């Protein structure tokens, strides 16, 4: 059951995503004009209790204002006391003509975040070519404590200042890839939560076993999603 008590209410329509599948691979088009998500403002942000340990940011919500500025303001407000995670989940068609401001916002939010998750494609868009682990360490130098890199059918990687862990993906027959990254994020966060690791202090002292558990639950969860 999803707890919705902190959700803002609006009579505006919901963002609509159109997905085109070719051999299980998805391309996206979004209708986001005058929607509830796009028009979220800072005065609608909830006050959060101490029981909320972690905030996740990502996706197309970080492209257009006022929502993009609102979510960045929420991160600025909450990052000193809570764990924050960001997955830019870049959709090139959605950011066309806005790449400069979008990149600047993503870079600011990455620098404030404790956890960053990127697909290998998003990593190269942000950081250029090169070795994935080295590029991840360059992101760590900006401020985060943990970087997850998903590498498609190969698997996923977790990089910290002293660790570089990799877990291979589960072999499945792919029906479509929609939601794979979101499911990985949920699985990885769930494993870190179950380990009691979603605090700033613990994220700086993760064991190899804890990283492997997060990668394993993330990749296995994503495997189920893409097989359906």
Model-derived segments and their meaning:
Residues 1-60, 64:
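Conserved N-terminal subdomain of the carbohydrate kinase-like
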Residues 2, 35, 76, 80, ...:
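Generic secondary-structure signature for well-ordered alpha-helical cores
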Residues 22-25, 101-105, 136, 163-167:
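Short, hinge-like loop/turn segments at secondary-structure boundaries
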Residues 34-42, 96-101, 129, 203-204:
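Short gly/ser/thr-rich secondary-structure transition/capping motifs
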Residues 45, 106, 174:
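Acidic, amphipathic alpha-helical patches
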Residues 54, 60-138, 144-145, 154-155:
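Conserved beta-alpha-beta core of the PfkB/ribokinase-like small-molecule kinase fold
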Residues 128-228:
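Conserved phosphate-binding/catalytic region of the ribokinase-like
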């Amino acid at each position: 059951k999803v707890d919705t008590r902190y959700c803002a209410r609006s009579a505006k329509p919901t963002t609509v995503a159109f997905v085109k599948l070719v051999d299980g691979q998805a391309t996206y088009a979004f209708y986001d004009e005058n929607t509830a998500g796009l028009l979220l403002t800072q005065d609608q942000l909830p006050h959060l209790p101490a029981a909320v340990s972690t905030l996740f940011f990502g996706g197309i919500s970080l492209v257009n204002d006022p929502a993009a500025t609102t979510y960045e303001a929420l991160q600025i407000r909450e990052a000193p006391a809570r764990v924050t995670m960001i997955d830019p989940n870049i959709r090139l068609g959605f950011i066309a003509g806005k790449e400069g401001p979008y990149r600047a916002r993503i870079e600011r939010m990455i620098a404030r975040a404790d956890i960053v998750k990127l697909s290998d494609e998003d990593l190269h868009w942000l950081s250029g070519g090169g070795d994935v682990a080295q590029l991840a360490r360059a992101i760590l130098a900006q401020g985060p404590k943990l970087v997850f890199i998903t590498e498609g059918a190969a698997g996923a990687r977790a990089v910290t200042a002293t660790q570089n862990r990799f877990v291979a993906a589960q072999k499945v027959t792919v029906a479509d890839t929609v939601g794979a990254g979101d499911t990985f994020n949920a699985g990885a966060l769930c494993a870190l939560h179950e380990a009691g690791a979603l605090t700033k202090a613990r994220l700086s002292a993760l064991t190899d076993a804890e990283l492997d558990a997060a990668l394993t639950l993330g990749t296995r969860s994503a495997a189920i999603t893409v097989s359906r």
